[in-house]
Amino acid sequence: MTTAPTSPALPASSDTAPTGPAPRGLHVITWGCQMNVYDSARMADVLRPLGYGPVERPEDADMVILNTCHIRERATEKVFSELGRLRKIRDERMSNGADRTIIAVAGCVAQAEGEVILTRAPYVDLVLGPQTYHKLPEMVARAARAGGAVIETDFPVEQKFDFLPTDAAPQTQGNLTAFLTIQEGCDKFCSFCVVPYTRGAETSRPVASVLAEARRMAESGVREITLLGQNVNAYHGDDGKGGSETLAGLVEQLAQIPGLGRIRYMTSHPRDVDQSLIDAHRDNPALMPFLHLPVQSGSDRILKAMNRGHTADEYRESVRKLREARPDLALSSDFIVGHPGETEEDFEATMQLVRDIGFAMAYSFKYSPRPGTPAAGQPMQVPEDVKDRRLAELQALLREQQDAFNADMVGTVQEILVTNRGRKPGQIAGRSPYLQPVHFDGPDHLIGSTVKVAITTRRTNSLGGTLIRETASAC
């Protein structure tokens, strides 16, 4: 940890839990992936003993954390723009007699650009990478003592897992769905991706730790968890017996937790789809029939340039095996168009793969160079207008497939986890095994239950249906 004398003294902090209600406001701004959502919740957890409780507006906060993402283009400039806004809010609070708001930058931009942040925004108090949020209380105390900014961007991911709070997070209490990080980092080094440089090497959380948090979540009312990891199907957590457990084995153990009726996982890498995971989709009804399996391109030449480690046909074969094991399995994926060197032939290969597979959902983006990644320095960068055209064509095909998938739901009966009231009086809502929002008439007491619903209509981004009342059951 390094300390830079660049900011006025912070409010004094306590290392003991308060005896009354949380006297300090905490506002967390989260950008990026589901793992950042999980990390933001855990940062709030570790700050609770210092008296911090959530507030909805940064204007009411004694501490603001900006949890950042470095994946998309212009991520760093977006951070500095937001920091400028937060500085104005802090200055206005102080002019009205409030204590000085602590401004912290966390996440992947902090990891990659920590020193730059303190140089360009010296009013920032704390800079911490995604593996060090468990050190937040120490960092707050140190910054208060030193009267300066504190930066912590090491990669002690094992320590992060060791120091997770042992009680159920307020963010999951009362919620029916939750994220649970089980693996971090990436060893794949795809040419376009910054994750290995911001999240570090692949590391898996011990089985006992995962199970303990999942049990706490279930006891607090969570009925569906999504297991998170940059390469979640590369999970190899310590099993406590001198060996390691696979993702399939972990899912089997999680499915035995009372009250936990649904399990999902993301994000997967095609190289790590093994037979045990395929068998889990066949044998474990708690594992939802919806899989996010990014392929990025349908061209073998571009896949090689991306350093993906598999071919388009190997991806097709993995999908074939998964669908053979679980015929109702639906897929989503990620695509990048305009990777350096991509030709019209390469792009057409991607379009053909999409036609061959058929996706229920997908995310597609134009390639944008990320500083420090191999692809950023590759020749034959594709012109922006070409990338725009290809992206539009790909997205049109993907939308067509998503619409067809949703249309195929009409006339089927789906098990819906009821999560909330609907927008209309007398209406409740939930989500299908395929993550589609479903709205239907029903009583509020069904919230938290899994019910069977006959799907009768499809809308642009949701489904409508009729409750089959006699099948209502607890998840």
Curated annotation (Swiss-Prot):
Superkingdom assignment: Bacteria
Domain TRAM: residue ranges: 407-469
GO function term, MF aspect, one: N6-isopentenyladenosine methylthiotransferase activity
The protein's Enzyme Commission number: 2.8.4.3
Chain sites annotated for binding [4Fe-4S] cluster 1: 33, 69, 108
Keywords: 4Fe-4S, Cytoplasm, Iron, Iron-sulfur, Metal-binding, S-adenosyl-L-methionine, Transferase, tRNA processing
Cofactor: how bound: Binds 2 [4Fe-4S] clusters. One cluster is coordinated with 3 cysteines and an exchangeable S-adenosyl-L-methionine.
Binding site residues for [4Fe-4S] cluster 2: 186, 190, 193
Pfam families listed in its UniProt record: Radical_SAM (PF04055), TRAM (PF01938), UPF0004 (PF00919)
Domain MTTase N-terminal: residue ranges: 24-145
Cofactor: [4Fe-4S] cluster
GO CC terms in record: cytosol
Subunit description: Monomer.
Function: Catalyzes the methylthiolation of N6-(dimethylallyl)adenosine (i(6)A), leading to the formation of 2-methylthio-N6-(dimethylallyl)adenosine (ms(2)i(6)A) at position 37 in tRNAs that read codons beginning with uridine.
Stated family: Belongs to the methylthiotransferase family. MiaB subfamily.
Name listed for the protein in its UniProt record: tRNA-2-methylthio-N(6)-dimethylallyladenosine synthase
Organism expressing this protein natively: Gluconobacter oxydans (strain 621H)
Name of the gene: miaB
